[in-house]
Amino acid sequence: MIDTQLPLTDLHRHLDGNIRPETILDLAQQHNIALPAYELETLRPHVQITKNEPSLVSFLQKLDWGVAVLADLDACRRVAYENVVDVANAGIDYAELRFSPYYMAMKHQLPIEGVVEAIIDGVQSALHTYDVEIRLIGILSRTFGENACQQELNGLLKHQDKITALDLAGDELGFPGHLFQPHFNRARDTGWKITVHAGEAAGAESIWHAIKELGASRIGHGVKAIEDPRLMDYLAEHQIGIESCLTSNIQTSTIASLAQHPLKKFLEHGIIASLNTDDPAVEGIELKHEYTVAAPAAGLTAAQIRQAQINGLTMAFISQAERDALIKKVSLG
């Protein structure tokens, strides 16, 4: 179901949600960090979804063991490097890797700017070996409050030329978007693109706010848009991209079943929506699964799946020249 003549993109992929279980074990051993289990198979239920979680917040707790082993900046470099390797091994041509430097720094009180630098270094190092296109998106983790997000933003701004966009993620219900308006005003002044997690745990009003007040040109998840016909029209008319993550939405119990997922209706409505992974290591999936298993289960036709693949390229935070180069590179094999 993947058109190999077209670039394959993953635009919603959390670097800190894709720390390999093997790496968690290895780093814990290196740094003498206590884990709930010390064998891969017994650790897996603690770091990977084995059954659907009751909420987004409980799903996010699975990520905590991955960042708990980031005891130094070398560990951050390693997971950044491995993220690029995983993108290449998944056959993805272009990925936007997003990360929250505060979340990664928090457990071991690492310098936030140092974490940003380590992520950039790890990615650049991997790109010497692996022929993929990578862009970085900084995340403000709303869960930790406005002050933490300001520290996060400051660290990201120190390397603003290496960061493509800013995102807002975390506890959408507990920390609504209006708290972070000053942060996003600053980000837009910098020239960054804006994508926001919205309409996942909260309703359609969260999406409206992300677009109108935070300046989002793309929305992460956005499933609750289906509840507001006026918003559906607006998304289509203004070409606001929806970064759909099918498996993730089931595992967080945001949507009860793939058959009920609104992605098909988004595409039928002319909304530019794409297929993405979210947190591959935590979910136990890769992008191919979203195309070959999840999308058909969500009722998408082969033509709609191909359209979602095209949409990924359309929505990507790159210039038209970069888009054309990517198309040419893939078509030439």
Swiss-Prot record:
One GO BP annotation is: inosine biosynthetic process
Could you tell me one molecular function GO term of this UniProt entry?
A: adenosine deaminase activity
Q: Which gene encodes it?
A: add
- Could you tell me which InterPro entries the record lists for this protein? A/AMP_deam_AS, A_deaminase, A_deaminase_dom, Ado/ade_deaminase, Metal_Hydrolase
Please name the catalytic residues of this protein: E200 (proton donor)
Recorded GO CC terms: cytosol
Q: Which species expresses this protein natively? A: Proteus mirabilis (strain HI4320)
Look at the named UniProt entry and state the broad enzyme category this protein falls under. hydrolase
Per the entry, what this protein does is: Catalyzes the hydrolytic deamination of adenosine and 2-deoxyadenosine.
User: Which protein is depicted?
Assistant: Adenosine deaminase
Kindly name one Pfam family recorded for this protein: A_deaminase
The EC code for this enzyme is 3.5.4.4
| Annotated substrate binding sites | H14, D16, G170, D279
Tell me which cofactor or cofactors this protein depends on: Zn(2+)
Entry note: cofactor: Binds 1 zinc ion per subunit.
